[in-house]
Amino acid sequence: MLADTIAAISTAQGEAGIAIIRMSGPASVSIAEKILRLPKSLNKFKFINSRVMNLAALYLDDAPLDYVLAVYFKSPLSFTGEDMVELHTHGGSLIAKLCLEGLLKHGARLAEPGEFTKRAFLNNKIDLSQAESVLGIIKARSEEALKSAARVLSGELSNKILEIRDEILNIQGSIEIGLDFPEGEEPLINNLELLEQVNKLILNLNNLIADCKTGCLLREGAGVVIAGRPNVGKSSLLNALLNKKRAIVTDIPGTTRDIIEEAIIIEGVYVRLIDTAGLRETDNIIEADGINLAREALNNADVKLWLMDASREPDAQDILYLQKFLDLNLDNSVIVFNKSDLASHTLDDGAGTPVSPSDNNIINNLNKNLRIINISAKTGYNLGELKNLIINLIVKDGSLNSGLNVSSKQLEELKACENNLAEIKEAVEINVGEVIIADLLNSARLSLERVLGIESSEVLLNSIFSRFCVGK
């Protein structure tokens, strides 16, 4: 337990129904009682029971300010694991500020950003992954991001990491005991058994990393870049997906000369739509800068949409730029034929079916694994299918229901463990010796423990919790 008592306003500034001021520390109860009185008699107020909401009069310097609700949480049954008090005043910046000043006057210290959550971690109420998930919940910009952060807060990530960590410890123990065996005695684990266990660890960790990658995309928002040659309808598609006019649309090539980014929620997922300048050779310096930004955006995109004009056959330049696009990465790329409403039509069972250059052998011969979809940004044809395709590419290595909202630092530690396990597998296969394998196992275990904060430096903790708001 920490010796001092901290206080802060936990609710946002401004007018509202209520404002909440919270305290944590050994003197929370005695400090709160100094500014509270019984509502009718105005006699001295005393907390009697923990976890019971009490009506009290708030007094500062013998002057009544407000009637408040006061609740006391006795250690260790509180968020921080310490004695805590919450005072619920009427909403308003001034009354909350004066209430906080009264607590500080009687011995509380103003809390630092994230200090309540930090104390919960230091008092073993939550581990570091759960502490970071609190920030994920606060900053969630979509329903799925919120759900994935809640899964981490509930301990799902911690449990999966501990399962892998415990398996590593078991293997590590068997190997290190074997190092003490006299030469000639049978080891506790042979190479075949070790390889089998390491492969199982790699599989479990890969599945966990896939869920965490999905969670990272949910947390940060997936970048979906709309690219293509000039005048294929990139800005029209952006406007259609947003269901509002955000980008200027004209028949003049090169209208879009800069990156235009807008957010949209698709199936509960936060998606950043990025409209780019049409790719072509140009002598215009401003347009050329926009084209360079478009290429950079494509390289960093989570999903790449390459638009083509369905109303005409592709020419040599279309094919050339399409091939350059396909050279980037097919895993998250889609060829989108826009303007299908202007394509010729045939009848199939009485229904009009657009016939576009996506059926052209020139396109298909570039790569047999192309994802191709026909749409019309103008009429809305197939936009729902395009959205579904985007979501499927975003969560291709996992599912929305298993995504775990983690930070990039946490993901780095999991990948470090993955690299260690790959090195262990190689070491076992070439029989390099148990000492090296034991060291690699230890490194893998430490990476997992850093995610949970089992061994964390003060510098790391300060870096994490300083990102929280005051009062959290």
What do the predicted segments below correspond to?
Residues 23-24, 89-91, 241, 276, ...:
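Glycine-rich, N-terminal phosphate-binding loop of Rossmann-like dinucleotide-binding domains
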Residues 124, 231, 275:
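Conserved G/P- and acidic residue-centered "switch" motifs that form tight phosphate/ATP-binding loops
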Residues 287-311:
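Inter-motif core of Ras-like GTPase G domains
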Residues 1-147, 151, 155, 329, ...:
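A glycine-rich (often HGG/GG-containing) alpha/beta subdomain
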Residues 55-65, 70-74, 254-282, 303:
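Switch I (G2) and immediately adjacent beta-strands of P-loop GTPase domains
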Residues 109, 270-272, 371:
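Conserved beta-strand segments of alpha/beta enzyme cores
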Residues 2-9, 13, 143-265, 282, ...:
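C-terminal-of-GTPase-core extension/linker across diverse P-loop GTPases
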Residues 273, 307, 336:
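Generic enzyme active-site microenvironment
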